[in-house]
Each structure stands twice: as structure tokens, then as C-alpha cells.
């Protein structure tokens, strides 16, 4: 192996810096496709100590059967995998892509100040378990319990009372629900093309789909998660979601990793 190759593999700091620089140069959006860039929140460092970690407790829900939380400057929703709570979100809600090296240190996959209760500044760390920037899907979980025990404890304390969503296949054409910036559920139309195993199209929302909703679940009439809010289509400065097809978004049963979907299939109805 060449000396310069050894240097790249050995220095995790260089790899992290390279990933961040690359992410900063990549810009979402154009005059046609408007990606939901979430609104900035108050920095976690400005919060009083007693507000930095607080558990998410169950709340009354009319449409959904799970917990939605803050992920970075966007959102995510809780699912269960082998007794552990994980968070599904849109990959563009993460600040940078983790290293692709197979021998990377676990801390290279850790995002600090990334999770928090819905509507609050993110203060809790998480580790990236899966990411697909093409489909715009990511799954994060508890940091390593040996090397980052304090961060792992904070993660579990935050999600102690969270209710995991059940993941199911989306109907080919049906009514769905989205959650607004104010935390209210509202209706929309969802559909996908089975013959091409396509993405989930969201159209005809009863309320505007706004920046800051990235990573939120797209929910079926039965309250189960079927997709992820990721993008909106703009035409001449106006949201085109009112047309028949609207915008394409990740469909969970197509875009999530198989190791997660296998355990979802074992959950009871």
C-alpha cells in the first residue's frame, strides 16, 4: 500500500473533514425541484442545561400511531428494531455523509446535537446506521455504548417513552396524512406505480407542504408509516403538489434496508 493511501485510511479526522467539505459543496434545489431545507432553530448550546435532554412522552394523536421528533434542522420518526428505538429520516436532514470506509471508527458515523423533541432544538447524539442519498433515506440509532456511553444514555432517555411507527406498504392510490410545522395532521393523496416499483407520489394536500417538514412520515389511513416527506415540485414559483401526481418521495417498503424491513414484518398488526 502506498504511504499516501495509508494516511487517508488512518486519519479519521481527514476523512470527516473531506466528507463535510463535499456535503457543503452539494446544493439541493433548482427552479423546478425545491427540496425542503428546514428552518433554523435556536442553537442547542444556548439552551439551559435542564432543557438539553428531556424524554419524549406520549401525546394524543388522531391520525398517526407513532412519535415524530426533531432531526437536525428537519424531522424523523421512531421505529423499532430488535427491541431498540431507531429513527428514520430524509438523508438531506443530516449535516454530512458518513465515511464509506469499512474500517472507519464508529464515532465517524456519529452526529452530535441531532435529535430532540418535536419543535425543540436538537441536543442528543445519534449514529448513522444506514444512508441512501439517492433515495434520500437515512436511519439513525443509539451511539456505541462502550466508547460513547453518555451519548447512548442520552439517546435512550430521549426516546424512552416514544411510540414506534409500524411500517407497511402504501396503497397504490389512497388518502394519506402529513404533519404540519404546527404539529397538526392534514390530508393528502398518495399513490405509486406497482409495475415499476416506483416512489410514493404526494399530491392535493389540504394544507401547504412547507420547508421544515423534511423527514416527517407520510402516514396511511390506518396510521402506519408508508413514506418520508422529502421534496416538493415548484413551477413558476408555485407549489405543483395540487396536480394529479405532485412530488415523488421515498416509499418505505422500497427504500428502507432489508434488515429493518424484516423485523417490521414480524410485528403484530
Residue ranges of predicted features:
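N-terminal targeting leaders that route proteins to membranes or the secretory/organellar pathways
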Residues: 1-46
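Short solvent-exposed strand/turn elements
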Residues: 95-96, 143-148, 204-212
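A generic structural motif
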Residues: 79, 85-89, 115-117, 136-143, 179-181, 203-205, 219-221
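Active-site substrate-binding loop(s) of clan PA
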Residues: 28, 36-43, 77-78, 97-98, ...
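Catalytic-histidine neighborhood of serine endopeptidases
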Residues: 34, 41, 45-49, 54-61, ...
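Active-site region of chymotrypsin-like
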Residues: 51-72, 153-160, 181-268
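Short, surface-exposed linear segments at secondary-structure transitions and domain or protein termini
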Residues: 131-141, 172, 195-201
